[in-house]
Each structure stands twice: as C-alpha cells, then as structure tokens.
Amino acid sequence: MSEILDLSFLSEMERDLILGVLQRDEELRKADEKRIRRLKNELLEIKRKGAKRGSQHYSDRTCARCQEGLGRLIPKSSTCVGCNHLVCRECRVLESNGSWRCKVCSKEIELKKATGDWFYDQKVNRFDYRTGSEIIRMSLRQKPAVNKRETAGQSLLQQTQMGDIWPGRRIIQEQQQREQSVLFEVPKTRSGKSALEAESESLDSYTADSDSTSRRDSLDKSGLFPEWKKMSAPKSQVEKEIPPGNQNAVCGDEGDMVFKKNTKKVLRPSEYTKSVIDLRPEDVAQESGILGDRSKSVPGLSVDMEEEEEEEEDIDHLVKLHRQKLARGSMQSGSSMSTLGSIMSIYSEAGDFGNISVTGKIAFSLKFEQKTQTLVIHVKECHQLAYADEAKKRSNPYVKTYLLPDKSRQGKRKTSIKRDTINPLYDETFRYEISESLLAQRTLQFSVWHHGRFGRNTFLGEAEVHMDSWKLDKKLDHCLPLHGKISTESSPGLPAHKGELVVSLKYIPASKLPVGGDRKKSKGGEGGELQVWIKEAKNLTAAKSGGTSDSFVKGYLLPMRNKASKRKTPVMKKTLSPHYNHTFVYNGVRLEDLQHMCLELTVWDREPLASNDFLGGVRLGVGTGISNGEVVDWMDSTGEEVSLWQKMRQYPGSWAEGTLQLRSSMVKQKLGV
C-alpha cells in the first residue's frame, strides 16, 4: 500500500476528469494488446506451415520452412544465422545490411521490436510491473482519511523517524534486493507504521499547522476597515516576520539565509469575470494573508516586498534573491561590498560606489542601417580604467549597453570579460532593431563593470549618447570619458517616458449597492464598493526582441499589500498599445477610508520562465505622504493621479476617467508639500 497516492484533496469533478483519462488509457492499452496478438498469430501461422508431420517422410536436404527439396549440392550460405536451419531462397528475408534470415527468425525480431519485449524482458527483473494508471485508480478508490489533530510532539517524533531513512537510499536498496530475489518489506518505524506513512502524516501535520498560522496572521493584518492602526508595525519587526506557508521563507536574520520550499500549494477559488474578492476582515480570513514578494525588476522597490509569482520559483531565483539580500545587508551596514552587477538589469544599478574612483575612457563607433532599421554599435576598447581591487591592482572589465529608458533583459547587450587589464580590447558588435523615429527618443548608455567572484560585480563608470543629437546618416566614431552614476532626478535629459495608462474609477456607496448582492456588513458599519476599470495602455516600452511586449496590469489597494488586495488583468500579447477592458472590484470600502488609501497600478511584461519585467506604474491617492497619521512612502501621488482620485471621491456613483503617465520607477517622488 506504500504506492497509494493521497488524492483526498481532489474535488468530485477533478476525480471524474481523471477517471475519464484513465478510461481512454485503458482503451488504448486494449487496442495495443490486440495489435500484439495479431502479430503473434502471424508468427504461429508461419511456424505451423513449416512444421514436419509424422505421416510424411522428409529428407535431410529440405527447407526447414516450406519443406521443399534443396538438391544435392547445398552451399554453406543456405544456413540461417539465427536458427542454423537450411532454408531455400523463397523463405529468406533480406535485411538492410545485406544479410538474410529465415521467415521465422525475421518475424520474431519484428515482433520483439513491435511489442517492446526487448525492454520488458529486462524491466520484469528490475521493477514491479504496476502502471501509473493502476496506482492512480487504486488511490481514487481509497476513501480520504479523517483529518486528525496531532500534537507538536507527535509531529516532531514522526519527522525524526522519517529522517532516519533517506528516500533515495531506500529506492536503491529496493532495487538491489529485487535483483537478488530477496523479498523486501518497507521498514517500520517505532510507531508501527511504515516510513512512507509516517512521512505523509508528518507532512499533513505541518501543512495543517502552517494553514492555521496563516489564517491567524491574515486576521491580524487584515483589519483594514476601519482599524488600520493594528496593522501598522515597525519596519524592523515586519522584516523579521516570516510569512507562514510562503514559497520562499527567509529564516533567521539577514545574514543567515535559509530558503524553504512550500510543501502545500494553496488551492485557488474559481476564476471570476471580475477580480472580486471582499476585503472585510471576515472574508480576508479565508484568504492567505501572506505578504508576497514583488517582482524582481522594479527599480526602487524593497526586496522584502517583492511579489511571489504564483508558485513559479526555481533554484536560480532563490540564488538571485540570496545575493540581493546579501548586497542589501552590506549597504545597510555601511560596508563597501560590491554590487550585484548583471545578475539582473535593474540590480546592476544598486550598490555603494564610493570606494571606486571612476577613471578612463571608452572608444566606440555607431552606424544606423536605414534598410534594415538597425542600430549597429561597435565597442572597440577602454583606456585607463580604475582598479576594482586596488591592493592587487586587478580588474576584470566588461561593457554593458542599454537604449534608455528600456532597461529590460531583452534590451541588454554585454561584451566578453577581459581579465587582469585596465586597457581591455573588445572589438565586439551589438545590434538593436529599432525604427528611426523611436531611436531619436532614446539614449544609448555604456556602463563598465568589473566581474568579481560569486557574481559580485563592481561599477567602474558609464557614458551616454543622446540619439536625438546624432545625425543617423553619418557614422560616429567617438571616445567618451567615463563618469560616476547619475541619478534620474539630476539628469533631466534622460528620457523617462514609459507610456500611458487609461483608467476609470467609480465609488459606489453602500446605500446604492443592490440588496442581496455583494453588500455585507463590516465591524465599522456597511462598506461601499470601489471599481477600477483598466481600459488600455498606450506606447508601452518594448520588452521583447521583436519590438513588442506581453503586458498585464497588477493592482494593490494600499496600505494592504497581500493576495487579498492583489488584482491582475489578463495578458495582452505582442502589442505596445494593449486593450485590457478589465475591472478590479474592492468591496467593503468606506468613503472616509479613501482619504488614507492609495491605488497602485503597475504594468509588467510577462516572462514565462523568468521574473517579469517592469514597464511602468502609477499611484492614485491624495498625495499627502501621510496615511492614518503616519508618514508613508507610497502616498506620493502627484498631478493627474491626485486629480483623478479626488474626482472619484467627489462624485460617488459616477465614473471618473483619466489618462495617466506611467512612472519609470516606483521610488518615492518628491511632494510639493
């Protein structure tokens, strides 16, 4: 019974679907068995025709298959290499290599190939013959076990017993003992249960405890309406808090990084036509109140608040997060640890550059091919770069280029690494496919980095070329001096246009909500409904190599930043002006609460096998920098963002529409207050 799977979490509809698949599998299996029987019958028929009968007399010089005479002179080549019988020319079957076999031997080989007997002959000696469909069918027949509450002592005891036997070693022992024809029994633990059963119960108790803890945390943190003061906690306390059930949990302090994989995938409710999830405390308790991670490519956002992307993490992501955490801890302690370099595009901009005095120049040439609408960049060499390791007089420089404001993964080009030199010679060519009109709005950035150990790269300098000042019909050969980092605020010449987002807002008071609908009572009274209609985006930044983006919009109603407050539109593929036409709905919102709230909308490019790329964002709120009497970074709305939010509050029950410029960074903006 150790092979039985725990399928108690499946619903009735899912069980029916699986049984339907198993039924089709059984039909295909029967059809294949019928084909094999037909081939075996053909082989038996050939053998029957060549069988010698006792009523007849046969000579020694007859064909072993058709019993015809072979004559007096029989050459040695008339013997079959498979069965060593004499065979006439009519009963031979030529093979691809020029040799031949008799009909019976040839048919037997064909039968083994067609039926897979050559594999199953060895499989029977090594494995128990039990198909996956049989195991699933047996598991579905088994009744789900009753959920029993276990004590912490029982859970720890079972985990200790489970750790005594490594699963990989157990499998090796099983295979070795089967080969020696020794009956193998699953080792029993001290509680009288098999190790696999103990492991299963231990896992169940862990997930049950994790689920109950996450529900308690969600109740504590979800007092958004109207009691937010309970959820305001010191930043250090929030950073030390470990969200239970989170896919990547960080245990201990920032220096001691231990990642755990979530052992239980939370089953999501069925999809709605609108993103409707009630935010009242009694409903939030049913959600997983987990503070998620935000996506890795947002400039200016805390690593601790980066959002988990639907259980899609892999080991590369964990390593990146580990390195980012180490670098952030280094900056907080005031040390001069090197930056993360090219681990990710955005995080190349992070780090402490005060310990490196930027020197040197970079030589390059530019050419624009009108026929193919391609910018060709020839990175030639660098002169007199700074030493990344002053003590050892060592630098391993490489050059990275971007067409700003696009700092996506697809927009990055990188040279090879030249080791132990401050005068590297590259002679490498990069190409950007971009139209002439769009190129005039970009700025070409060269940045030079030292490649250090463990991915800790050091910034050595950068230079920019404003493409609107260059005549594209002429080839440009230039040698620019390198300089230190220039912030976006101190360099207004750098283009920061990320596109526009068209949204409509409407607040419906509780008195105007339909009776019997989503209208529910919260502790502070009845709450209304906030509707956010995401209509379209215009002129987004191209994140894909073909000059397009697969974009979607993600929303949070701050100060609550968890899955209960998260909304997402569908992904619009291969367009820079997508029409989303999707509505976010937040229930249980009171009109007076809107003074202390902020709606954050961010646009992302979808990357299936990696972290998503940030394309821009907006924050809609009153823009005072204060929420519920406390200074917060996210209440930084300006201009049209404030006007649209105030218009929505001023006219309840009516749509307020606006076109908002997307921010290039979600760092706190300077407020004119």
From Swiss-Prot:
A GO term from the CC aspect: plasma membrane
CDD domains documented for this protein: C2A_SLP-4_5 (cd04029), C2B_SLP_1-2-3-4 (cd04020), FYVE_Slp4 (cd15764)
Region listing for Disordered, in residue ranges: 184-253
Result after altering I18A: Abolishes interaction with RAB27A
Keyword RNA-binding assigned: no
Phosphoserine: modified positions: S202, S205, S218, S222, S275, S490
Positions of the RabBD domain: 4-122
Tissue: Detected in the pancreatic islet, in particular in insulin-positive beta cells, and in pituitary.
Entry's localization field: Membrane; Cytoplasmic vesicle, Secretory vesicle membrane
Membrane topology: Peripheral membrane protein
Domain of life the protein comes from: Eukaryota
FYVE-type Zn finger ranges: 63-105
GO molecular function (one): small GTPase binding
Domain C2 residue range list: 358-480, 509-635
PANTHER family hit by this protein: BITESIZE, ISOFORM I (PTHR45716), SYNAPTOTAGMIN-LIKE PROTEIN 4 (PTHR45716:SF4)
Functional summary from the UniProt entry: Modulates exocytosis of dense-core granules and secretion of hormones in the pancreas and the pituitary. Interacts with vesicles containing negatively charged phospholipids in a Ca(2+)-independent manner.
Protein's recorded name: Synaptotagmin-like protein 4
Native source organism of the sequence: Mus musculus (Mouse)
The gene coding this protein: Sytl4
